[in-house]
Amino acid sequence: MRLLLIDHGCCDVPDTRVHHCREHLEKLGVQASACGPSSISHLASHQPGLHGIHLHDVAAASKLFLRAVQDGTPIALLEALATISPSLLGLVRETARQMVAEAVDANLPDVIFVFHAGILTDLAIETGVPVVVHVSFSDLVVAGRNGFMRQRVTAAIASCNGIVATDADTAQALRQEWLSDDVHSPDEQVPIVIWPPSPNSAADILAVCQCALSRRQYRA
């Protein structure tokens, strides 16, 4: 099985969560690649299977967003994206879209697994590949502050073939405030799995991605 892991946090530092998950997935026989914001403006050398989204040049237009990119954490990026101007957000989306598309073309993943519900979840859906999203409560809080972001994140989550919530409170919020019963019939609703993210989540990621792929194939 081929998986593309997308994180809203820095992806090119060896001790990051996405790196640990990728390594553990490969031990399970999965061909795993990774995509996410880069900690530097350009990678010093190409790392096979790693697709860094270089946002530093775009972020230079906003001190707040530049600090978030330099910070490298998912929450910093998501919070900054909810506050930047529509024009800058458009530039960020286009930059990220190109790299996500490149990662998909290069690795031909069976499923995309996205850490956090945000702009990259939306772009993953656009590729047409089955998508699983891992949602934390903070993702929903941040997206809820911006009308455009809430609209995009809501549509993205509803379009996913698999949904994982960090905890029961997040799952409840998703069901009550983000996933409308009118969108799908009961038979089409995607069940929400609950488990917290960790660098050792490889087996859980593989299981939920296998279910998502089966669900997509069944509906096809």
Regions found by a protein language model. Give the residues of each.
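A short, active-site helix/loop in glycosyltransferases that binds the activated sugar's phosphate group
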Residues: 161-187
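N-terminal subdomain of nucleotide-sugar transferases
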Residues: 1-56, 205-206
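Short N-terminal targeting/anchoring amphipathic segment
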Residues: 89, 100-118
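C-terminal amphipathic helix plus adjacent low-complexity
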Residues: 196-220
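Membrane-proximal helix-turn-helix segments that form the acceptor-binding/catalytic region
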Residues: 146-163
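A conserved catalytic-core segment of Leloir-type glycosyltransferases
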Residues: 34-99
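Active-site proximal beta-strand in glycosyltransferases
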Residues: 111-114, 124-142
